[in-house]
Amino acid sequence: SGDVTMTVTGDDGREQTQVFPLSVMAGQLSPGQHEFSVAAGIPDDDSDLEGGVFAASYGYGLDGLTLRTGGVFNQDWQGASAGAVLGLGYLGALSADGAYATAKYRDGSRSGNKVKLAWSKQLALTNTGLRVSWSHQSEEYEDMSSFNPAETWLQQNQGRRTRDEWNAGISQPVGGLFSLSASGWQRSYYPASTTGSYRYADDNGKETGVTGTLSTQIKSVSLSLGWSGSRNMNGENTWSASASVSVPFTLFERKYSSSTTVSTGKDGGTGVSTGLSGALNDRFSYGLGGGRDSDGGVSSYLNA
């Protein structure tokens, strides 16, 4: 989606993920309530960005309406967004977001935009969650996660860029024992670029996919099983599956949380990652970990 995701660890050692800010923000604020977030960090080993990243967002609640704005800044990539969440009462909630980003390539800067509309509804009788979303982005919009400032724009544009994406999902708790969720998506692309002026006329196909998750919590231990499958424009299928466990614990009167994920896919490889997070005080938290992906690549991270 192009969002910048940062993990914040609370005093109890549990992790909370915050997204800054280029996505639909579904949470509504009470009238007169303010929400302000600031974060700074260093890109991980999988990123081609250099230098630090600073992110900030602000939200304000009105009667039935939440307004939000935010920005993410790096020396080579800057993005800003604004959005609103409107409560529709019995009909659920509707959100609209827009984002604008500028990426500085080796041969100059390019700017683009994206918009996203989303609807969600929680059925009170069964506690079933429903959601539908649509997003569109211009061809020159560049996600921070895929941006490489060492390349030219043409080099980055050799592959297909997302044009439109539809998502639909449903979630359902079952008897207080576990929760099930399923979603499907369809994505269309701009034609792939081969030179500055020539494009394959038929390289504008669609891809589709589905995902499913089963999650539960046994006392303080969280367990999750996931599966996903997709089909590309050439009719080729792929799939992946994962299992994860998160265990909070206390050591020397400090609270921590450990997490481990095992994943596999169509090609048969197995990936394993593990991490540990904690907090020294109300203002300072940290996380560290590492692992091996299904292709044998090794990675590690450290954040604070």
Give residue spans per PLM region:
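Glycine- and small/acidic-residue-enriched microsegments that form turns, hinges, and capping elements
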Residues: 62-64
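C-terminal catalytic or substrate-handling cores of phosphate/nucleotide-
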Residues: 77-78
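Short, solvent-exposed loop/turn segments at conserved positions within beta-propeller repeat blades
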Residues: 49-51
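Flexible, glycine-rich linker and terminal segments associated
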Residues: 1, 9, 14-39, 43, ...
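Edge strands and adjacent loops of beta-rich recognition modules
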Residues: 53-55
